[in-house]
């Protein structure tokens, strides 16, 4: 059942991203893995405008002392996204083939939600990966709540991300 969902999610992403990549005549599958992560984030986040403040670019949350403007160009937003993803990748590069999947998830939910902080323990997802358990689809897709409610858009996003970046 979950394999069918993965396949459907992957097909949805390929169909939706086709127009984005058609401008350069590049297939999603032909891109290097990090570039696929960038395309995936750009698709799901979109370029944020004034109504999404304090988020700018492709979902970057402004931190104290940062002075990025809401009126970023697409090129500036792309550079900021790549810098953010590389910073997050540094946290997870020790996780081998799951590093990109964890990087992508942490861009949306935060590094602290995965690694744990303060009184919050490490996520069950990381615990399973560290234990060598490769059956963590349920734990990955469980990061689909906003203010306690399950959002179907986030469920679909997690399914597509898992289909694209999970390596058995």
Question: Where do the PLM segments sit?
Answer:
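Long, amphipathic alpha-helical surface segments
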Residues: 11, 23-48, 60-65, 72-91, ...
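Early exported N-terminus immediately downstream of N-terminal targeting peptides
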Residues: 53-56, 60
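Short N-proximal segments of mature Sec-exported proteins
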Residues: 99-113
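Bacterial N-terminal signal peptides that target proteins for export
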Residues: 1-8
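Sec/Tat signal peptide C-region and signal peptidase I cleavage site
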Residues: 18-22
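Bacterial N-terminal signal peptides
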Residues: 9-17
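Surface-exposed patches in mature extracellular/periplasmic domains of secreted proteins
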Residues: 49-53, 91-101, 139
């Amino acid at each position: 059942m979950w394999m069918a969902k993965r396949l459907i999610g992957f097909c949805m992403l390929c169909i939706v991203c086709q127009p984005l990549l058609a401008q350069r005549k590049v297939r999603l599958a032909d891109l290097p893995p990090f570039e696929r992560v960038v395309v995936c984030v750009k698709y799901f986040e979109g370029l944020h405008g004034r109504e999404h403040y304090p988020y700018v670019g492709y979902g970057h949350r402004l931190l104290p002392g940062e002075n990025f403007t809401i009126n970023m160009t697409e090129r500036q937003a792309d550079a900021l996204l790549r810098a953010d993803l590389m910073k997050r990748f540094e946290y997870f590069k020790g996780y081998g083939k799951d590093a990109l999947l964890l990087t992508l998830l942490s861009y949306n939910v935060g590094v602290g939600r995965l690694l744990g902080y303060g009184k919050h323990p490490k996520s069950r997802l990381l615990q399973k990966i560290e234990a060598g358990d490769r059956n963590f689809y349920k734990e990955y897709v469980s990061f689909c709540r906003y203010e306690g409610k399950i959002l179907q858009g986030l469920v679909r996003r997690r399914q597509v991300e898992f289909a694209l970046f999970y390596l058995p």
